Amino acid sequence: DVYKRQDGIAEERRFYYGAQVSRGNIFKYPANVFVEGEETSLFYGLETDGIYQTGDVLPDVFGSTAVPGDVKIVDQNGDGIIDLNDRTFIGNPNPDFIYGFNFNINYKRFNASILFNGVFGNDIANGNLLQLNNAEGLTYLNISPDAYYNAWRPGNAGEIIYNEYPRIGYTTNGQPAMTDRIIEDGSY
């Protein structure tokens, strides 16, 4: 497979695909990859850049033309078509630091122990956001209020609208790869 580095240079490297992330339906391609010379299990999917607005140029996205209110996926290779060739690294589940602290105290027949541990600098893929942040319609009623009330809606002519959430009815069902919209900081 071809791997595109951060500086934009494409290299031929061995890819090994990892595990799936889903909400009952499974993406056609795994969420993480193992790339020779890189850290293990990097999240591999589609980078997004907001929501398509009325008046935007709408590309083909996996064989269908995007509509206003859809999630805007970055065309990584610049060919004007959104497909699997536009996947890139979208997160790193490997922590920069792992830390811990253990404290024990004993006095006669009383003892107490406190343990703190955590990680810093890693990403997680929060599969709950696949449903909670998309108002897909009547079949998916368990969405966040923010995703519903701040979903994309058409504006008046000339009105500039910035929406964090896609239109009501936008679906991630059948999407072949996950997007960076479900990647979060996993530090604790």
Regions from the PLM with identified roles:
Residues 1-188:
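Outer/extracellular conduits and scaffolds centered on Gram-negative outer-membrane beta-barrels
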